[in-house]
Amino acid sequence: MGAPTERLVDTNGVRLRVVEAGEPGAPVVILAHGFPELAYSWRHQIPALADAGYHVLAPDQRGYGGSSRPEAIEAYDIHRLTADLVGLLDDVGAERAVWVGHDWGAVVVWNAPLLHADRVAAVAALSVPALPRAQVPPTQAFRSRFGENFFYILYFQEPGIADAELNGDPARTMRRMIGGLRPPGDQSAAMRMLAPGPDGFIDRLPEPAGLPAWISQEELDHYIGEFTRTGFTGGLNWYRNFDRNWETTADLAGKTISVPSLFIAGTADPVLTFTRTDRAAEVISGPYREVLIDGAGHWLQQERPGEVTAALLEFLTGLELR
């Protein structure tokens, strides 16, 4: 199979840079990255999935990398994020795809079968589980849960605040996010992340002694270079739509995901400290499987590329896509 290529695709009023691999006409797999990442975060999976016979489309999603970065906060709501990827299917003439997402990309792919049921053959999500609709706006729920404690999602809500911290030193931001996130069992790290006070998000993450074994300096520099050029505001604006997404999807209350679904997470992912995997049954009515990778952290498809790719291929093989 040839090496992955890059091209620009106009979709849903924005232009996305898309990494593409595999034969046109083969079953399509969309790979949706999270925060603060890029299509590059799927660099290990893209060639492997293409070699297995799939047509892979991995965009820099809106707000990131080589893609459009609209100024309006509401331009990053869940309706637009899912519609962007539907537009990629239209571009290649595909009726449906398997939607795979990590972190915020997982939120996008969990919503896709609810908003665009006819365009989704199956869903695979990493790190962020499927959750039932909250009874109150999400930021209200977070404030009730965390009180006066620091919580990064609430910190991200005010335009300009987190932007200034993260944009001030993109190398520090990426270094600490990649190497400074600690597993749920690290109590001192948990206390530091929750402690009330003026410190920002990156301030609370430890400066790693060195890079994790799973990422090279060259790979980290790719992220640093892109975020130095673009800043982090586009990605932060996704967080600023939590309540808007809740308000504008009220009609989805009670609807469930009926397509085959896979959830993959690392047991050392700090996201699992404030989400519950056991509530997936409340929103998923179709076939569902969960894969937990022992000791893996948040940057799952980069930390454990072989295990993630194997889980995805096993899932894909069991689907009737051809």
UniProtKB/Swiss-Prot annotation:
GO molecular-function terms, A-Z: epoxide hydrolase activity; hydrolase activity; protein homodimerization activity
Catalytic site positions: 103 (nucleophile), 298 (proton acceptor)
Annotated organism of origin: Mycobacterium tuberculosis (strain ATCC 25618 / H37Rv)
Subunit structure: Homodimer.
Keyword rRNA-binding listed: no
Family: Belongs to the AB hydrolase superfamily. Epoxide hydrolase family.
BP GO annotations: response to toxic substance
Protein name: Epoxide hydrolase A
Site feature location: Contributes to the formation of an oxyanion binding site for the epoxide oxygen of substrate: 152, 239
Domain AB hydrolase-1: 27-131
Function of the protein: Could be involved in detoxification of extraneous host-cell epoxides. Catalyzes the hydrolysis of epoxide-containing substrates.
InterPro entries reported in the protein's UniProt record: AB_hydrolase_1, AB_hydrolase_fold, Epox_hydrolase-like
Superkingdom of source: Bacteria
Gene that produces this protein: ephA
Enzyme Commission number(s) from the entry: 3.3.2.10
Keywords, sorted A to Z: Detoxification, Hydrolase
Reactions catalysed according to its record: an epoxide + H2O = an ethanediol
Residues flagged as site, Plays an orienting role for the imidazole group of His-298: 269
PANTHER family linked to this entry: EPOXIDE HYDROLASE
